[in-house]
């Protein structure tokens, strides 16, 4: 029974890692698409300094927004989990 629980835990960790990787890949893809559309008017062999600066600032803002949303969502999940646990304790 303990071995089965350990395998289940390991499987859950692998699934969480795969989800995190998929989320990171999706974020990178969206960031690339949005910043490219915003900053690159005429694609060529290289980026000029204005395009480089725009890409850098766009990526920084995108990451800041992503981190803010992630923290806020994580905090909300924790609050809801805490409320659920309190509710369960009250009914016991």
Curated annotation (Swiss-Prot):
Bilayer topology annotation: Peripheral membrane protein
Task: Give GO BP annotations, semicolon-separated.
Answer: protein insertion into mitochondrial inner membrane
Spell out the InterPro entries in the cross-references.
Tim10-like, Tim10-like_dom_sf
Give disulfide pairs as residue numbers.
35-58, 39-54
Keyword set, alphabetical order: Chaperone, Disulfide bond, Membrane, Metal-binding, Mitochondrion, Mitochondrion inner membrane, Protein transport, Translocation, Transport, Zinc
Q: Which domain of life is it from?
A: Eukaryota
Its localization reads: Mitochondrion inner membrane
Motif Twin CX3C motif per record, residues: 35-58
Q: Which Pfam families match?
A: zf-Tim10_DDP
Query: Quaternary structure per UniProt?
Result: Heterohexamer; composed of 3 copies of Tim8 and 3 copies of Tim13, named soluble 70 kDa complex. Associates with the TIM22 complex, whose core is composed of Tim22.
What is the protein name stated in its UniProt record?
A: Mitochondrial import inner membrane translocase subunit Tim13
Q: Which organism is it from?
A: Drosophila melanogaster (Fruit fly)
Task: Tell me the gene name.
Answer: Tim13
